[in-house]
Amino acid sequence: MALSEAEVRHVARLARIALSDEEIALMQAQLSAILDYIAMLQEVDVSNVPPTAQVTGLTTVWRPDVVGEMLTQEQALANAPDQQDGMFRVRAVFDE
């Protein structure tokens, strides 16, 4: 699927990316190649592949969720540049 120059410019504008004319031409070729590859992948017959299939054979890759050693409040705040009432104090993020 070949993308037009206008389509590449539109995508760049949506992404808020400024591209030169040379970059537009390069992106046009690269994005068209990617879309061609996706079209080729869509032709692969996956009718016999269960939706939940995976290839590693692993049943779980996560460790058990076990509570470990924790810092006390004093230890956690020991190196805080600013604290108040036992909590980290940071600059306001939102204006009120």
From Swiss-Prot:
Biological processes annotated in GO: glutaminyl-tRNAGln biosynthesis via transamidation; regulation of translational fidelity; translation
Per its UniProt entry, which superkingdom is the organism in?
Answer: Bacteria
Q: What reaction does this catalyse? A: L-glutamyl-tRNA(Gln) + L-glutamine + ATP + H2O = L-glutaminyl-tRNA(Gln) + L-glutamate + ADP + phosphate + H(+); L-aspartyl-tRNA(Asn) + L-glutamine + ATP + H2O = L-asparaginyl-tRNA(Asn) + L-glutamate + ADP + phosphate + 2 H(+)
A Pfam match: GatC
Which keywords are on file for this protein?
A: ATP-binding, Ligase, Nucleotide-binding, Protein biosynthesis
The Enzyme Commission number assigned here is 6.3.5.-
Q: Which GO terms describe its molecular function?
A: asparaginyl-tRNA synthase (glutamine-hydrolyzing) activity; ATP binding; glutaminyl-tRNA synthase (glutamine-hydrolyzing) activity
* Entry keyword annotation includes ATP-binding: yes
- Give yes or no: UniProt keyword Ribonucleoprotein: no
The family database entries (PANTHER family) matched by this protein are listed as: GLUTAMYL-TRNA(GLN) AMIDOTRANSFERASE SUBUNIT C, MITOCHONDRIAL (PTHR15004:SF0)
Query: Which NCBIfam families does the entry mention?
Result: gatC
Subunit structure, interactors included = Heterotrimer of A, B and C subunits.
What family name appears in the similarity comment?
Belongs to the GatC family.
What biological function has been recorded for the protein in this entry? Allows the formation of correctly charged Asn-tRNA(Asn) or Gln-tRNA(Gln) through the transamidation of misacylated Asp-tRNA(Asn) or Glu-tRNA(Gln) in organisms which lack either or both of asparaginyl-tRNA or glutaminyl-tRNA synthetases. The reaction takes place in the presence of glutamine and ATP through an activated phospho-Asp-tRNA(Asn) or phospho-Glu-tRNA(Gln).
Q: What is this protein called?
A: Aspartyl/glutamyl-tRNA(Asn/Gln) amidotransferase subunit C
Gene symbol of the encoding locus:
gatC
